């Protein structure tokens, strides 16, 4: 499958490496190609395009011919990248929802009809759990001869002597300033 990964940070670069190992034809785009290449590693030959993820034309031009568009950018860019996927007639996968407009309904659901009309699949909010968790398991399993069973227990705590962020700076800021979700009664 021809796959284009938009956003080549920690999660995006791991996806690129795993998909390449599985035999997919992968290219990627990022606003900072040099940083993306550092995430991919010095020996990587995977093409990295400079892409403005706030511009549909920039995404479509870089991802032309992709059958799957993976959005590993901050969730605030979801709507733009979803429109690009529809224009490309590509399947779509993203990591998170940007819940500021409606904290109980992912904004990606507004695009459901467009994907159905094109007979394309959109998988939304596949980020940390199970997304990144499964990617880390797959990367670890590749280092072993055999794996019989994997059990996952998700525990939302991070402990370290130095500061650790599970999100990019943009996502952490977005989470901090988003309206809270209130449950009553």
Go through each PLM region and give its residues.
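Helix N-cap at the beta1-alpha1 junction of Rossmann-like dinucleotide-binding domains, i.e.
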Residues: 32-35
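Aromatic pocket-lining residues of Rossmann-like dinucleotide-binding sites
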Residues: 19
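Conserved Rossmann-fold cofactor-binding substructure of NAD(P)-dependent oxidoreductases
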Residues: 51-65, 77
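Beta-loop-alpha module in the N-terminal Rossmann-like domain of NAD(P)-dependent dehydrogenases
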Residues: 58, 71-84
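Active-site-lining helix/loop region of Rossmann-like oxidoreductase modules
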Residues: 6, 142-185
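Hydrophobic/small residue at the entry helix of a nucleotide-binding pocket
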Residues: 11
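N-terminal Rossmann-like NAD(P) cofactor-binding module of classical short-chain dehydrogenase/reductase
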Residues: 63, 67-72, 92-93
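Rossmann-fold NAD(P)-binding glycine/threonine-rich loop
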Residues: 96-121
């Amino acid at each position: 499958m021809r796959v284009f990964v938009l956003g080549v940070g920690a999660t995006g670069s791991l996806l690129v490496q795993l998909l390449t190992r599985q035999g997919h034809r992968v290219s990627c785009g990022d606003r900072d190609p040099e940083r993306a290449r550092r995430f991919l590693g010095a020996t990587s030959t995977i093409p990295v395009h400079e892409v403005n993820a706030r511009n549909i034309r920039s995404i479509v031009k870089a991802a032309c011919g992709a059958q799957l568009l993976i959005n590993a950018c901050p969730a605030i860019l979801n709507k733009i990248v979803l429109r690009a996927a529809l224009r490309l007639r590509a399947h779509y996968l993203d990591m998170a929802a940007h819940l500021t407009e409606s904290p109980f309904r992912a904004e990606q659901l507004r695009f459901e009809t467009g994907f159905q009309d094109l007979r394309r699949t959109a998988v939304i909010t596949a980020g940390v759990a199970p997304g990144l968790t499964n990617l880390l398991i797959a990367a670890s399993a590749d280092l072993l001869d055999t794996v019989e069973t994997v059990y996952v227990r998700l525990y939302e705590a991070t402990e370290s002597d130095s500061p650790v962020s599970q999100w990019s700076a943009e996502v952490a800021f977005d989470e901090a300033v988003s309206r809270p979700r209130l449950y009553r009664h």
